């Protein structure tokens, strides 16, 4: 399986997003103007369809050396599409291998059965994200507002509903999509930050944050996953 580096392309968007987001609250001193309908259509035509078929995620079980440095990423096949659904443009991910999240759940007695059940789960899941086109030049960029990712797991003598939560673009500058300048290919990034077992109130999530060791580094602020067009 091919290993790639997820974060190398994100920096340009982060800088642009951080700059414009600081200048949207004052109409007299605003650098950002919402896209026109024609510009949104241009963005849609450049991103719509079944373009992104690969998923990249952090994994210290898959290690490669590049230029003397170790990289901890793996790629898998997924089915991802962007289409207009009524008033909204939606990114739909099908065949998502939710078992990859097992490595990010804290290791303790309370989570042992959950982690084992998740590792063994071979049934992929589907989820959606609302797409909001943000920029058409110099790079087409879009915000993402993802639904929770849900799976039913059998363990401990019962069926449990487990939900995984992603930051929206409104809460994380590392959740976004774009068309690359060099090759004109579509890619999207999501930050998954936590999970909840058998939610008491699905309208008011109360997730447990991911907390995991990746190649000797303790991480507790989520993990970024990438969908991309090969």
Identify the residue ranges that each predicted region occupies.
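Bacterial Sec-dependent N-terminal signal peptides
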Residues: 3-45, 227-228
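Edge beta-strand at a domain terminus
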Residues: 27-37, 164-168, 177-230
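Tryptophan-anchored aromatic micro-motifs
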Residues: 41-66
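Coil residues (strongly favoring Ser/Thr
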Residues: 42, 75, 88-89
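Generic short beta-strand segments
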Residues: 52-61, 95-99, 145-152, 156, ...
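Acidic, glycine-anchored loop motifs typical of Ca2+
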Residues: 61-73, 202-203
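Polybasic, proline/glycine-rich intrinsically disordered low-complexity segments
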Residues: 77, 81-83
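Predominantly extracellular/secreted and cell-surface proteins with exposed
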Residues: 84-174
